[in-house]
Amino acid sequence: MTQEERRRWLICYLQREMPEYAHYGIPNDEAGQWHLLRALFNVRPPAPVTQKFQRIEGELLKTITAAKGIVNGMALPASGLDSRLALWQDDITRLRIDAIVNAANSQMLGCFLPNHNCIDNIEQTMAGVEMRYDCYKLMQAQGHDEPTGKAKITSGYHLPARFVLHTVGPIVQGSLTDEHRRLLASCYESCLTLAAEHGLKGVAFCCISTGVFRFPKDEAAHIAVRTVRHWLDAHPDASIERVVFDVFEDADLLRYERLLYT
C-alpha cells in the first residue's frame, strides 16, 4: 500500500467504528488526510483494534517517522557538566532510545483534543491507538486516577523508542509552593526508578508541567537537572547510562544549555 492508501484505509476503518464522524469527507491532499486521520486517532475511545489495523497503522506511522529522521539518543553528545546527560532540541518522537517520557494527565488516556500539539497528543498519535488502550487497562486495574509524581510504563508501539514512561506533573494554580517542587522532582525520580526496574539504559525526558500546567520554566529546568543528577549519583549500579533532556523551544534550549554546559 502507498501512504495515501494507508491513510484512506485507516480513515474509513475509524469512520465505520465511529459513525458520528462519518460525514467528514476524505480530503484529496496529503495534509488534509493526515489532519483528519490524526483527529480520529485523538478522539477514539480506548478499545482494541484488529491485527490488520495495527499493521497498516504501524506502516504509516513508521514511514512518517523515518521521513523525519530517526536519531540515536544514546549517541547524542554528552553534556560538558555530566557525561551521563545530553541535550537535544527537536521532536521527541524521533528518538531511538529505550524510553521517552510523556507528560500525561491523571486519567492517563492521552489528549482527546483533535490535532492538539501538546506532548501527550503528539506521543500518543505517533505511537498509535494501541497505547491509549494499554493505558486504559493499566488504569482499570489500578482503580483510580494516577497520582501526581508517579509513573507508568507502556510499550512504545510504533515509536522508535521501545517504551514510554507516563508521568503526571503538578498543576500550578497561583503561587509556586514547595509541594509543587517536590512533586515535580518526584516525576523525574519515578520515571528513572521505573526505567531501572526494567533494565533500561537510556531515557529521554520532555519538559514536564511547563505547558498548560504552568510550572515556571526556569525553576522546572533546575529541578529536572538537579533531580536527575542526584538520582544517578544515588544509584550508581542502576542500568541507566544516558539521560536526554529534550526541548522544543529555543528559550528552553538556552535554559538547559546554561545548566548543562556552563
Report the location of each language-model feature.
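Macrodomain-like recognition of ADP-ribose-binding/processing modules
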Residues: 1-262
